[in-house]
């Protein structure tokens, strides 16, 4: 009986760890990160510049975030 309870507990723990690591991997895969400020490197296809900035790719792949007002 103790072996069955231990196995159930172990299974639950493995499931929790696997679920947590898959969610973290999903965040990394989706490219979640902080936004990029002025003159920071960006990706034109991902819109990762902060609000008020746009990604300028005059010399790809060296794209940088530029101010919308300037």
From Swiss-Prot:
GO cellular component, one term: extracellular region
Leader peptide range in chain numbering: 1-20
Any Pfam family hit: Toxin_7
Gene Ontology MF, one: ion channel inhibitor activity
Keywords from the named record: Amidation, Disulfide bond, Ion channel impairing toxin, Knottin, Neurotoxin, Secreted, Signal, Toxin, Voltage-gated sodium channel impairing toxin
Main localisation: secreted
Disulfide bonds: 35-50, 42-55, 49-65, 57-63
SUPFAM superfamilies, alphabetized: omega toxin-like
Top-level lineage group: Eukaryota
Residues making up the propeptide: 21-33
Residue numbers carrying Asparagine amide: 69
UniProt note on tissues of expression: Expressed by the venom gland.
Location within or outside the cell: Secreted
Other comment: Negative results: does not affect mammalian sodium channels (Nav).
Function: Insecticidal neurotoxin that modulates the insect Nav channel (DmNaV1/tipE (para/tipE)) in a unique manner, with both the activation and inactivation processes being affected. The voltage dependence of activation is shifted toward more hyperpolarized potentials (analogous to site 4 toxins) and a non-inactivating persistent sodium current is induced (site 3-like action). Interestingly, both effects take place in a voltage-dependent manner, producing a bell-shaped curve between -80 and 0 mV.
Family: Belongs to the neurotoxin 07 (Beta/delta-agtx) family. 04 (aga-5) subfamily.
The record's note on its domains: The presence of a 'disulfide through disulfide knot' structurally defines this protein as a knottin.
Protein's name according to its UniProt entry: Mu-agatoxin-Ao1b
Record organism: Agelena orientalis
């Amino acid at each position: 009986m103790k072996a069955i309870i231990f196995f159930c507990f172990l299974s639950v723990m493995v499931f929790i760890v696997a679920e947590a690591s898959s969610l973290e991997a999903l965040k990394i895969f989706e490219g979640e990160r902080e936004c990029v400020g002025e003159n920071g490197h960006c990706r034109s296809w991902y819109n990762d510049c902060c609000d008020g900035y746009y990604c300028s790719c005059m010399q790809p792949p060296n794209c940088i975030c530029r101010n919308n007002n300037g």
